[in-house]
Amino acid sequence: MPGNKYNCSSSHIPLSRTERLLRDRELREKRKSNRARNPNDVAGSSENSENDLRLEGDSSRQYVEQYLEGAAAAMAHDDACERQEVRPYNRQRLLVVANRLPVSAVRRGEDSWSLEISAGGLVSALLGVKEFEARWIGWAGVNVPDEVGQKALSKALAEKRCIPVFLDEEIVHQYYNGYCNNILWPLFHYLGLPQEDRLATTRSFQSQFAAYKKANQMFADVVNEHYEEGDVVWCHDYHLMFLPKCLKEYNSKMKVGWFLHTPFPSSEIHRTLPSRSELLRSVLAADLVGFHTYDYARHFVSACTRILGLEGTPEGVEDQGRLTRVAAFPIGIDSDRFIRALEVPEVIQHMKELKERFAGRKVMLGVDRLDMIKGIPQKILAFEKFLEENANWRDKVVLLQIAVPTRTDVPEYQKLTSQVHEIVGRINGRFGTLTAVPIHHLDRSLDFHALCALYAVTDVALVTSLRDGMNLVSYEFVACQEAKKGVLILSEFAGAAQSLGAGAILVNPWNITEVAASIGQALNMTAEEREKRHRHNFHHVKTHTAQEWAETFVSELNDTVIEAQLRISKVPPELPQHDAIQRYSKSNNRLLILGFNATLTEPVDNQGRRGDQIKEMDLNLHPELKGPLKALCSDPSTTIVVLSGSSRSVLDKNFGEYDMWLAAENGMFLRLTNGEWMTTMPEHLNMEWVDSVKHVFKYFTERTPRSHFETRDTSLIWNYKYADIEFGRLQARDLLQHLWTGPISNASVDVVQGSRSVEVRAVGVTKGAAIDRILGEIVHSKSMTTPIDYVLCIGHFLGKDEDVYTFFEPELPSDMPAIARSRPSSDSGAKSSSGDRRPPSKSTHNNNKSGSKSSSSSNSNNNNKSSQRSLQSERKSGSNHSLGNSRRPSPEKISWNVLDLKGENYFSCAVGRTRTNARYLLGSPDDVVCFLEKLADTTSSP
């Protein structure tokens, strides 16, 4: 949207995320203040308050109608207000996508529909929010198979700013009643998956999941049809977990947020779901993922870490450089609506009647859906125990329980209804009299006015949810208690406990004794303590409104997109394959340096299971690379080096049949496939630290399940990739602390930390440090007479080894003379004491780029010659990796440059890593395969 503050480019972007969010908050407050000064504000007009206050009656429908239909008036008013500000402001379009529209449709004729507004929690959250121009997308709740009916309904809904998604009966049955209500909802509330003993039922799960994905795609199709550039798409709840992925596949630049209104279970619960990985990855496609509480957000990040093996950060979840922000956004209510309602004559009359009806008795209140997670039986049993232990209260207290029926056709809910009725009847029969009973139970909902009156006269509200995303009944009770200042007893398993816990009495609803004791505490609480508790909760409810919740979420979503754009600007672009191939074909002498692990390795088919340890530890060349590698190796103008941290035996097994150079253990060992292994660094490295480090690695391997360590000639590696992620990190931290203060405190070693590994290697053993010497061996072996004018370096290298990318990096502009590295002559390159040839020298301006550690290592070795051990003595007898003839005498003086490399002919590319020194990126080994196939085709073509 042109001119939109969220889309325009600004010459100044605040440095920090917090600064940007604070500035946006100030602008919102300023606009609210301007609107408050205008008496014609449609949404904020107080003269209509009496007609706007009913949850389930005509007044509620009028209130929401006013919100949905008053867009034009609101926008006109906004324009008038914003003209008073420094600059104009255009409201951002917000596409709210939920399973159900905030209307119920009834067909009156072939092309006639009657629409009834149903003010649910989500609608209430957005009532009065004038920051956005909202459109609602969802299912209308009816099956409309004919085209005439669909067009008529779409036209009628358009007047309400609603857009329908048409789902047939079979989809609704499988997707909504099946997968959403029978699988996801119970799982997210810790009720577990259905326990079935028939294969047919298992097959029905598969069909339900397929319907779930299909329905989400249908929602995405409607969103895509109405999407305009700059819109924010806000997806809601567990019904639409696949929607973010579907939307991003359509338009990767779309701003997508997803919010869950239920709890998110612990990773141990979520991992029981057969489709666990698909759902998590689909949600991670969103830019911002929101939950009611930090606990739910933490569980989600933990599930992504433990199930998908991704990196969890304080900001969210990171996958190959892309960050999905995960945060808590506690929802609220429209508190002013409840406060104003207490002044309505109808509510005042209700309050008077209730006070007269229950005069002389303390009133306790429970308002719940008749649902398994609401803990109604536990609440009533706790009340029974209280009456049993406190005979003096039996005729002084009454419990009013409002149980709104839901899913009355489901056997489990019918059983719950019977159970509640049985308990209530037993208690009333035991403690009741001819004139009064201790429990008044209603199986129906109350209108808004009656509910507000009931809240206002209540002394103690009792919320005993076994699991609840938030539970706004507690908020509504607090909002109506400004005069009475009653006490809130709140389940610690309700999301509201995180927000109202300081002022409420928190209880474990499963502990009947504790709840009964809390009832006594609440009824006997002093007025002073009640006032303090209420003041805290009332302030929270007043300030953390539903409108503020919606504005905060969308504001953070917009800023998350800005943050992502800033992050992406620092990420190298994707490898320009066409350009790389063209320059390859035009060059005369090419050098290809390829990593192995996570670059040329085969994919592991683990059917969505993370960490198939046995298969992944056995590194194998990607089967589709055999042909391309042979074609590239057969080209006399192309030299290929596989540069890997793997051992010599692994490289021999995978590349023995190819005509290429193999550099094992980060370039420490080198050989042409038809030759013998040689060392590229001095043999006498200080390796006295090996035994003590190995002892430490063994200790932590024994105490970290599924971890292992590898012993190589120049390094030791402890790997915890397959261990529990969090436990592995703790163990790695302790291991490093022990190493630094003990075995390697004075040793000449480098410690390299991978994402799931710790490596200790001899000082100076890096891929970049070895390249200079490898290059000299290659030039000497091939008797090159033409300088190398094209270099391609591709790999998934750890940060310590990324100096291989910068080794060839020209520092002059591409239009200036090429960088030249001279081949040293025999008289200028003095030999070391062991007879090793020193590395070719670099141009002066490259002296600090790589190889500096090698120099320090050589000096260290010369100074500590008495403590050195030959690497050859470390090899096991019978090894095929003999170092015989590992060194050749220096060649005769060569009068030409080894490298004649210009900037445009150098392509460094990181695989699966976005934080890199490389110029370009490739996403995965499969992308490497695709590129090398194209390169091989160029080599094969005449």
From Swiss-Prot:
A biological process from GO: plant-type cell wall biogenesis
Description of what induces expression: Low induction by sucrose after 24 hours. Down-regulated by dark incubation.
Catalytic activity: D-glucose 6-phosphate + UDP-alpha-D-glucose = alpha,alpha-trehalose 6-phosphate + UDP + H(+)
GO molecular function term, any single one: alpha,alpha-trehalose-phosphate synthase (UDP-forming) activity
Annotated Gene3D superfamilies: Glycogen Phosphorylase B
A Pfam family it matches: Trehalose_PPase
Effect of a null allele: Embryonic lethality.
Entry comment describing in which tissues the protein is expressed: Expressed in seedlings, leaves, roots, stems, flowers and siliques.
Top-rank EC class of the record's enzyme: transferase
Region (Glycosyltransferase), start-end ranges: 92-559
One Gene Ontology term, aspect cellular component: nucleus
Signal peptide residues on this chain, from the entry's feature table: none
Start and end residues of each stretch annotated as Disordered: 28-57, 815-892
Cited function: Required for normal embryo development, vegetative growth and transition to flowering. Regulates embryo growth, cell wall deposition, starch and sucrose degradation, but not cell differentiation. Involved in the regulation of glucose sensing and signaling genes during plant development.
Notes concerning its domains: The N-terminal part (1-88) has an inhibitory function on the enzymatic activity.
Protein name: Alpha,alpha-trehalose-phosphate synthase [UDP-forming] 1
Gene behind this protein: TPS1
